[in-house]
Every structure is written in structure tokens, then in C-alpha cells.
Amino acid sequence: MQLNPSEISELIKSRIQGLEASADVRNQGTVISVTDGIVRIHGLSDVMQGEMLEFPGNTFGLALNLERDSVGAVILGEYEHISEGDIVKTTGRILEVPVGPELVGRVVDALGNPIDGKGPVNAKLTDAIEKIAPGVIWRKSVSQPVQTGIKSIDAMVPIGRGQRELIIGDRQCGKTAVALDAIINQKGKDLICIYVAIGQKASSIMNVVRKLEETGAMEYTIVVAASASDSAAMQYLAPYAGCTMGEYFRDRGQDALIIYDDLTKQAWAYRQISLLLRRPPGREAYPGDVFYLHSRLLERAARVSEEYVEKFTNGEVKGKSGSLTALPVIETQAGDVTAFVPTNVISITDGQIFLETDLFNAGIRPAINAGVSVSRVGGAAQTKVVKKLSGGIRTDLAQYRELAAFAQFASDLDEATRKQLERGRRVTELLKQPQYQPLQVWELAVSLYAANNGYLDDLDVKQVLPFEKGLRDNLKTSHADLIKRIEDTKDLSKDDEGALRSAIEAFKKSGAY
């Protein structure tokens, strides 16, 4: 077969046009210095803020400081093998973590790697840990409750799906206990929970996981752990990783609850990284953007509209709104809520639950100070029956606290004042609750009804809790239909109220407590 010259040139041209050059264009730089997990790199001219960088030994870092002559990066993991002169490559990728239902029931680190010894996660999707929160147009007002099962919270500081409610208090006053009770109470309520442990002892995290397994709560919970022995970078990233895992469910029309325990430790880790990167320190040596550190995280918790979910899923999920509820925890020093990080987070969130050491030591547990605890949006999400019955409790407690302060100085009190003080003591006793024993809506309603209608007034203070427990047990055995109606309707009709009154009076007469 002979080819003429024109055919040969055409053939060569077509071959040249069809040639595919697979050159991997990557920017390279050199390590100048390594100090405490912070690396300075020279020669990376084309690098993004927050981009992943590849170091020798399959180690990755995060570019945080972009300067004229060098890049400051934080190493994710071990950095002992990295030395001056090592080659660093850009990856062109922002840090991502695995997301999806495969993570439920697992314990993972801040990068989504399993650390529970149960094998690989096998998640099909990954997502960026830094994302922009949904805009105002895509949000819906909070209207559905998150029942924590804790009497004082559900009655006086209600939490709604899509809300950000801060839990704040000194160390060892029950902040984690409140958060765990909220998770345990979500059994059968179609709410995925994410518990992010930041800077805690590994043994404490293990105890939390064990308790969640014992109560069957791990079936719908993801635990993201960055313990005290992990690097500052891991403690800084863990909340964002947990938030991304929660957003997967929110954006697909499901409900999720995330607990950050605690954000004070994250702020400390970020302060450490910032100071090592030579960023200028401000108040309490925190960097200037520590407010933005927490605001961009907590703004991602939201109730999103049906249109947002439909648009996000390309029409696969219709008519369903999703939510991500955040319960950030902040640790104060000697009750000082005017410190930098506590005031920042108080201003970002939709309310706060104050826990006080004095109340805790006095045996009032959970040690919630109802006077200064507020929920700015949760009232709209409260169930009808609890909303109807809880108003009186808040008033009784407020008046009791005011009168108790004056009663210390007064020797003779009039009858009305003494009655008010006695009622307040019994309500305070009623709101005590053991850990890991969350209550259903009907149980809370019955307790509130008994307190509001004076059934506790003639009891001795020590009899209040036995009476409450005995009453609940009695209703379970003798009035199951009444319980079912309250649970189904989340309301107390006139007929049901009459039946409940008769049941309480009959139980009180029997004296079986």
C-alpha cells in the first residue's frame, strides 16, 4: 500500500491533534522551618487559603498563612519526620471529610478516620469541612421541638430544631451530662446526633461512648473525637468536620443534632496555632478572628426550607425541610461569663443554659439557673401541653428567688410570703433529675400539672420526688389510655384534664408514696 505525500501529512496532522499529554501540573516548595507542628514553606507561589499540602511520607498539612515570601502551614498528624529542605507539593484540593449514613454508630477522628477498631467506614461521599452557611432566603423559622427529656430545660428553656442553644458553666458542673441526656432522649425520634469531643481526656471520651452504647443511643449517633493528646490542628478542625457530617442530613430533608463539647478548647487550640504562625494577638492573646472562628461554625446550624432541600437534591427529595440543631458547650473560669470567648458565643447563639457550681454543690442537679437561662426562639417550638403548663413554674421560681433573698433578713413573714416560699422550695425539688433518666412529654406534663395545681404544697419537701415517681408509675399501670392521648396530641383536653385530676387525687389519697 502506497501513500502519496499529501495523505502522509494529513495522517501526521491527525495523529498530532489526537495526542493527549497527561502532564500533572503541581506547584512545589521547600520546607524552611518546622516548629510545634507549624511549617514555613518557600516557593509555593500558587496556593489557596485552606488548601491541603502534601509532605513526604504521605503526610498532609493545611495552608493558613499566605505571605509574600513564604507560606505558613499546620501539619495534620505527626510531624517528627519532616525536616528542613523537604519538598512540599500543592494538591489543588480543600480539606474534605467522609459524610453519609455509613458514619452513624462510629467513632472517628477530626479527619473522619475510624478510631473505634470496627474496620473502615466505607463512606461513598466526602464534603468540604469549610462551607458557607445557608442564606436568609433558604431558612425557615424554628417550629418543631427537640425534647431533651430534662424537666427544667423542656419546661423553661425549650429548644427547637434548627436552633443554637449554648450550654455554659464552670468545669465539673454537669454540662456534658445535660448534652448526653439530650442525645439519649432522641431514641425513636428520627434525629441523627453528632457528639464532637474537643480536647477531652481519652478516658472521658471512652466513658461517653460506653454510656451511649449501653443506652442504645450509638445506633443514631456519630462521635467525632479530638482528644487532649491530639494536635492543636485536630482540635481546631474537629467541630467543622462534625458540622459537615451533620449538614449531610440537614441538606437531605432530615433532622440532626450536634454537640460541640467544648468550644473553649477549640478556641485555645486556634490561639496556639495563631501565635505559632506569628499572627498578632489581641484580647486574652486570642487572634483578631476568634469571633469569626465560632460564628462561621454556628451559623451553619439552621432550619432550611423545602425549596432548599429540593434544589440541593436536584428534585429527589420534595416537601421536606431539614434542620441542624447545635448545642455548643463553653467552660467558664469561676463563673466569669464576661470573658472573651463566652461573650462571643452568647452573642452568636439563640439563647443559653447557665449551669452554676453553687447549685450543683447544693444538690440541685441539673444545676440550671432558670433566672438567667433563656431560649430566644424555642418558645415557638414548645409542645402545646408543656407551653400551657410551664408558665406557672417559671413565675413561681422567679418569685421564690426574689423572696428567698429578702427572707434571710426578715424574722416574721406574712402567710402569703411563706406560702410562696414553700411552693418555690417544692418546685425546685421537683426540677431535680438523676442523670441518664430523660422524661417523655406526658411525664413532664403530669409533673408540671401537679405543681401548678397545688398537689405538692402540703407534701414534705423530701416527699416530692417519691410522690412524682409513684404518680408516674401509677398512671402507667392504671391510665395507659390517658398517657397515649397526651403523647399523641401533645395537648391536654378538658376531658383529659379532668381524668388527670381525678387520678392524682386518688393516688394522693392512697398515700402509696
UniProtKB/Swiss-Prot annotation:
Cell inner membrane listed as a keyword: yes
EC class of the enzyme, as a word: translocase
Keyword tags: ATP synthesis, ATP-binding, Cell inner membrane, Cell membrane, CF(1), Hydrogen ion transport, Ion transport, Membrane, Nucleotide-binding, Translocase, Transport
Chain positions recorded as ATP binding sites: 169-176
Pfam families documented for this protein: ATP-synt_ab (PF00006), ATP-synt_ab_C (PF00306), ATP-synt_ab_N (PF02874)
InterPro entries: ATP_synth_asu-like_sf, ATP_synth_asu_C, ATP_synth_asu_C_sf, ATP_synth_F1_a_nt-bd_dom, ATP_synth_F1_asu, ATPase_a/bsu_AS, ATPase_F1/V1/A1_a/bsu_N, ATPase_F1/V1/A1_a/bsu_N_sf
Description of how the protein assembles with itself and partners: F-type ATPases have 2 components, CF(1) - the catalytic core - and CF(0) - the membrane proton channel. CF(1) has five subunits: alpha(3), beta(3), gamma(1), delta(1), epsilon(1). CF(0) has three main subunits: a(1), b(2) and c(9-12). The alpha and beta chains form an alternating ring which encloses part of the gamma chain. CF(1) is attached to CF(0) by a central stalk formed by the gamma and epsilon chains, while a peripheral stalk is formed by the delta and b chains.
Function of the molecule: Produces ATP from ADP in the presence of a proton gradient across the membrane. The alpha chain is a regulatory subunit.
Name of the featured protein: ATP synthase subunit alpha
